[in-house]
Amino acid sequence: MNNKYNYKNLKWLWLSILIMLLDIGTKYWVKTHFWIGEVLSVLPGINCYYVCNPGLAFGLFTNASLYYRWLFVWIITLVIVAFIIALYKLIERPKCYSISYSMVIGGALGNLLDRILYGAVVDFIDVHIKNWHWPTFNVADIAICIGITIVTIRFYYDFIKNNLY
């Protein structure tokens, strides 16, 4: 019998849960030790800056109505489900796909919980060089970005390898 699904890939959901718990824990620490808008210099160019982002990544749609904010919740939920299904269906793929999908799932779950519970995502990592500031982010955002970067690089590598050789 040919099984077209790989249950073994679901074992990587432990990484999703770990990332989600780390994200929740760091956000809880920030919320219990800082006032909104408070800044603490951690290292040169890195601050702990407690902000709440009701919009999407990079502050997009910050002024969106409540209707659109809940629409984002549903869309993000569907994306998480799609990544879990994709993880489940990965067959004969390098392990980095499972790891990267799990990172995206964990990060998305962490930010989704904030949206549902508080109506906004808690961000607190502020990176800057002189007057240039990267948008404030959190542990979930780091996991999502690393996960997407890994799968993009690997996908590109596989594409080149399969089409040039």
UniProtKB/Swiss-Prot annotation:
The active site is at D123, D141. Its EC number is 3.4.23.36. Keywords: Aspartyl protease, Cell inner membrane, Cell membrane, Hydrolase, Membrane, Protease, Transmembrane, Transmembrane helix. It is found in: Cell inner membrane. This is Lipoprotein signal peptidase. HAMAP family: LspA. The lineage of its organism: Bacteria, Pseudomonadati, Pseudomonadota, Gammaproteobacteria, Enterobacterales. It comes from the Bacteria. It comes from Blochmanniella pennsylvanica (strain BPEN). The gene is lspA.
